[in-house]
Amino acid sequence: NRHFDEDNLLNWVATNILMDNMDTDANNFFIYSPLNNNKWLILPWDYDDGWDSGRSQDFIRPYQAGISTYWGNRLLNRYFRIQENVDKLTAKLEDLHEKYINEQTVTTQLDKYASFVEQYVQKYPDNQYLPIIGINYQSEIQSIISTPIRALERYYEDLEKPKPFFQHNKAVLEDGQHIFAWDVSFDLQGDDLYYDVTIARDPAMQQVIYQQVDLRLNEVRVSQLEQGTYYMKVTVKDSVGNTQTSFDMIKDSDTGEY
């Protein structure tokens, strides 16, 4: 509360979650301090990947739901490590969903202009660039209407999962061994965490050179490898079986994203 307005912060996170606006973890917002206020406020900006539309994009990762979406944000990472703050967000989400962002309120807003807009998305130039022409239009409308409740369900599911983490980009050579490492995950319930790691010569992880499961440490050591490019995939699971991926991805121009 010294530097940020907590209610503003919670409203911003909760609104983005309910509207499924995932591309807000480290961008697409302004930080603003008005002249008559000594605290910083977060102003929303850019919702073009919200309302379920972003989930069809290839840059959206499996971890992007609920609090995990913001785990790479240092401020929110520190804030949500405290259970009291998680409880505040849950209360804020439930309040906003009950009063403002739900199936009924979204339907009311869509009813004001959905039929008017439909005639234009069928015509040039929109019909050349929008993926919601023809029979898809009504299904898109229904997807928007159901976004808040599905987002809230994903939020509850994400609370049980370990949080995503970063893998280290370089393998350190030490005493004739290459060390492959990653950051430690975090579990909101304090469950024990176990890592599964695979190292391969290809991004599809088909040419495997090392594999181990149920590791408690956040590194593995393998005998010195030949010079070249190697790929590592690490996942984490808690003691009751909830799993999570790392933040990392790689885009291969020939075979796609991993």
State the predicted function of each range.
Residues W182, V197, V222, M232-V234:
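An aromatic-rich alpha-helical recognition segment common to small helix-rich domains
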Residues V240-Y258:
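Extracellular fibronectin type III
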Residues S185-Q206, T243:
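Solvent-exposed loop/turn segments flanking beta-strands in beta-repeat/beta-sandwich domains
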Residues Q224-T243:
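Beta-strand-rich modules
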Residues N1-D25, Y32-D187, D192:
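Middle-to-C-terminal accessory/interaction subdomains
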Residues L215-R221:
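Short S/T/G- and acidic-enriched coil/turn segments that sit immediately N-terminal to beta-strands
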Residues S33, I199-P203, V236-D238:
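Residue-level signal for short segments within beta-strands and strand-turn junctions
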Residues N36-N38, A204, Q227:
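Short strand-connecting beta-turns/loops that link adjacent beta-strands
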